[in-house]
């Protein structure tokens, strides 16, 4: 089942009911979902595996629990760092100092060579501007498209 922003326009109580229904149907009927959402809280609740995209390319694919605990791609890290943790709102759910993305968002009609995230990446290397990183397995079941996790990278 493909669910594209299936609960984004719903109020909180209806959203919770629909999400619980998705989970119940998945467990009872063995359904698989491709659940598209910009709401990472929803993704965390309904997903076993998560794929993060940036400007139409996969940045990272991992089991949901691992991705939310140990994101590898700088974009995924920034997304998670922007989600406030429950409490005073000064910390994020990802145990890393929250960092705002800087730099210009590339023009989606005239995309740059190399990594699409390079202009906003805090770890940008010269290689990033020239070569688009391939999606590679950095850990078992955890793939990332980032030069930090390839030969010559820092990790």
Predicted regions and their residues:
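P-loop NTP-binding/switch modules centered on Walker-like glycine-rich loops
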Residues: 5-93
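Short catalytic/signature loops enriched in Gly
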Residues: 63-155
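Active-site beta3 strand of CheY-like receiver
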Residues: 2
């Amino acid at each position: 089942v493909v669910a594209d922003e299936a609960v984004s326009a719903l109020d909180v109580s209806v959203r919770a009911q629909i999400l619980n229904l998705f989970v119940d149907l998945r467990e009872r009927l063995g359904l698989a979902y491709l659940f598209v959402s910009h709401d990472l809280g929803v993704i965390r609740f309904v997903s076993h595996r998560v794929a993060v995209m940036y400007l139409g390319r996969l940045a990272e694919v991992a089991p949901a629990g691992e991705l939310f605990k140990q994101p590898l791609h700088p974009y995924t890290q920034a997304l998670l760092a922007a989600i406030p943790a429950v409490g005073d709102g000064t910390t994020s759910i990802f145990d890393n100092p929250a960092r705002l993305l800087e730099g210009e968002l590339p023009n989606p009609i005239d995309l740059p060579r190399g990594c699409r995230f390079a202009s906003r990446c805090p770890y940008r290397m010269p290689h990033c501007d020239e070569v688009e990183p391939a999606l590679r397995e950095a850990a078992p079941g955890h793939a990332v498209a980032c030069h930090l996790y390839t030969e010559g990278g820092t990790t």
